[in-house]
Amino acid sequence: MTKITIPTALSAKVHGEGQHLFEPMAARCTCTTIISSSSTF
């Protein structure tokens, strides 16, 4: 939090990579939940 002098482009790049890593993980979790819930029927 002390590094407020970070360029916006760099922080946007890091945020973009964070989203890139998080999106597949969230999608996989959602797919697993749907599969497990549908297999209980």
UniProtKB/Swiss-Prot annotation:
Predominant subcellular localization, coarse grouping: secreted
Gene Ontology cellular-component terms listed: extracellular region
Lineage: Bacteria, Bacillati, Bacillota, Bacilli, Bacillales
Source organism superkingdom: Bacteria
Species annotation: Bacillus pumilus (strain ATCC 7061 / DSM 27 / CCUG 26015 / JCM 2508 / NBRC 12092 / NCIMB 9369 / NCTC 10337 / NRRL NRS-272 / CCM 2144)
Name of encoding gene: pznA
Name this protein carries in UniProt: Plantazolicin
Cross-link (5-methyloxazole-4-carboxylic acid (Cys-Thr)): C29-T30, C31-T32
In-chain residues carrying the UniProt-annotated modification N2,N2-dimethylarginine: R28
Modification after translation, per record: Maturation of thiazole and oxazole containing antibiotics involves the enzymatic condensation of a Cys, Ser or Thr with the alpha-carbonyl of the preceding amino acid to form a thioether or ether bond, then dehydration to form a double bond with the alpha-amino nitrogen. Thiazoline or oxazoline ring are dehydrogenated to form thiazole or oxazole rings.
